[in-house]
């Protein structure tokens, strides 16, 4: 996950056009999200220990490579960013929370610029095995390219994805002063909890509704200003409908005027990196004027019609 993070961060820094020699790196932070962190390291180290023979031992790099905040640390060390630096760990919301925290640190005047996003690398025996034991994964192994099918009546679980998404959030006047290429403005964020179950969402989407309402209030906009929603849409039987209930609950009748899609149908579920990757999808939807599709939704679940077109 830290390797994914470093590559995505390098792409973001390059795309930003920032001259690192002309900025105050004390005012540049890294706030990163990862739901699991170094799961591959954990797996390989425990396996090595168990098979270690007469004197089993763990590598001195075991802990530094495993903990989730090392991605933020690696990025800061590479570029000399000495501002706020930490990792948000909140399962599939990890990089969403990282972006909200980044927004607020800039608002508070604690940073001029923050490199934010998330990464995940959980396609390994414990990652796949653990989610499989929870019956969270699709079993459409005979047709994997159609396995991720949010809102389809035959959806049966998510497909694990791997990777990273990185964004540079920057104080507006600071960005203008250096002639930055500005893709969009981040105007608000909201956070909440269902307080319901440790894996299943609230059946009426109560936590999701609160997060969206708080984001709209924080942004100072009205629900009618929204014309696209990139939903979580993991392709699980339990998750997709409550989310649409939440969107409809927040937008009211305006929901019928809004484009809604799940890009997880194309990327799979990147777990803690999902929010950052999907934020990029939204940014490029704005940039190019194209709404990303929900592929594989061939037989729409009739229950979704109650909440959206």
Question: PLM features: residue spans?
Answer:
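Condensing-enzyme catalytic core mediating Claisen C-C bond formation in acyl metabolism
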Residues: 142-219, 228, 294-297
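Glycine/charged-rich beta-loop-alpha catalytic/anionic-binding loops adjacent to active sites
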Residues: 50-61, 78-88, 145-153, 192-193, ...
């Amino acid at each position: 996950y830290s390797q994914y993070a470093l590559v995505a961060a390098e792409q973001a820094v390059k795309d930003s056009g920032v001259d690192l020699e002309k900025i105050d790196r004390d005012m540049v932070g890294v706030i990163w999200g990862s739901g699991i962190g170094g799961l591959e390291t954990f797996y390989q180290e425990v396996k090595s220990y168990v098979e270690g023979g007469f004197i089993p031992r763990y590598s001195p790099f075991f802990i530094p490579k495993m903990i989730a905040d090392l991605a933020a640390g690696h990025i800061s060390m590479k570029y000399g960013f000495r501002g706020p630096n930490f990792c948000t760990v909140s399962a599939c919301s990890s990089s969403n929370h990282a972006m909200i925290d980044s927004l607020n640190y800039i608002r508070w005047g604690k940073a001029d610029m923050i490199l934010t996003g998330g990464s995940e690398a959980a396609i390994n025996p414990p990652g796949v095995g653990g989610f499989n034991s929870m019956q969270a994964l699709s079993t459409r192994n005979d047709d994997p390219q159609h396995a991720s099918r949010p809102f389809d009546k035959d959806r049966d679980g998510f497909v694990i994805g791997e990777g990273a998404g990185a964004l540079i959030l920057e104080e507006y006047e600071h960005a203008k002063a250096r002639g930055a290429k500005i893709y969009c403005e981040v105007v608000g964020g909201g956070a909440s909890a269902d307080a319901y179950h440790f894996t299943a969402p609230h059946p009426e989407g109560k936590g999701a509704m609160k997060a969206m309402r708080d984001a709209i209030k924080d942004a100072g906009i009205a629900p009618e200003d929204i014309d696209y929603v990139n939903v979580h849409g993991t392709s699980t039987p339990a998750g997709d409908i409550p989310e649409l209930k939440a969107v409809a609950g927040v937008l009211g009748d305006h929901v019928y005027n809004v484009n809604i899609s799940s890009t997880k149908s194309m990327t799979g579920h990147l777990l803690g990196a999902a929010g950052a990757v999907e934020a990029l999808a939204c940014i490029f939807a704005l940039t190019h004027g194209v709404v990303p599709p929900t592929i594989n939704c061939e037989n729409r679940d009739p229950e979704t019609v109650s909440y959206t077109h």
